[in-house]
Amino acid sequence: MVATGSLSSKNPASISELLDGGYHPGSLLSDFDYWDYVVPEPNLNEVVFEETTCQNLVKMLENCLSRSKQTKLGCSKVLVPEKLTQRIAQDVLRLSSTEPCGLRGCVMHVNLEIENVCKKLDRIVCDASVVPTFELTLVFKQESCPWTSLKDFFFSRGRFSSGLKRTLILSSGFRLVKKKLYSLIGTTVIEEC
């Protein structure tokens, strides 16, 4: 930073003259020309790339839930809170931003916690051509609503029971556990959202 001004000398006598003449230390700054620090404009290409990456990650998570609903969860519908997969994708991008290979070095294990038991749903490798540098374990949580069990009770006794399976409702909360694979210390970060 370069500052110029009307002071010819910066010795203590010159400064004391200014202070005695009615200048206040706060007003000294207004007498100098100075460089303003300008925040750089965000790179539009980076913003578009990050948004595209986030949307691709959202699609991966939604496909994982869609594949798992009948095979591993045994239900006909999975109700996902609005913007849940978007929030998860943003957190995954944030956690991967400090990694050497970024999101490309991520392996994500997707689980569902039902009544304090974790059920494995899928394993997502973000880029198979890159050696993984960290693992993320995503744990979806089931919504604990009493009305869902009543609905299942009433529909399971009628003539509609053969065609209907239960509906799984996900909670808006989730857990992300990050484990670095290249660190000797084995750094683990747990985020509860």
Swiss-Prot record:
Key word Cytoplasm present: yes
UniProt key word Cytoplasm: yes
Localization in the cell: Cytoplasm
Cellular component annotations (GO), alphabetically ordered: cytoplasm
Name listed for the protein in its UniProt record: DNA damage-inducible transcript 4-like protein
GO biological process: one example: negative regulation of signal transduction
Database matches in PANTHER family: DNA DAMAGE-INDUCIBLE TRANSCRIPT 4-LIKE PROTEIN, DNA-DAMAGE-INDUCIBLE TRANSCRIPT 4 PROTEIN DDIT4
Family note: Belongs to the DDIT4 family.
Source taxon at top rank: Eukaryota
Stored Pfam families: RTP801_C (PF07809)
InterPro entries named in the record: RTP801-like, RTP801-like_C_sf
Function: Inhibits cell growth by regulating the TOR signaling pathway upstream of the TSC1-TSC2 complex and downstream of AKT1.
UniProt KW keywords: Cytoplasm
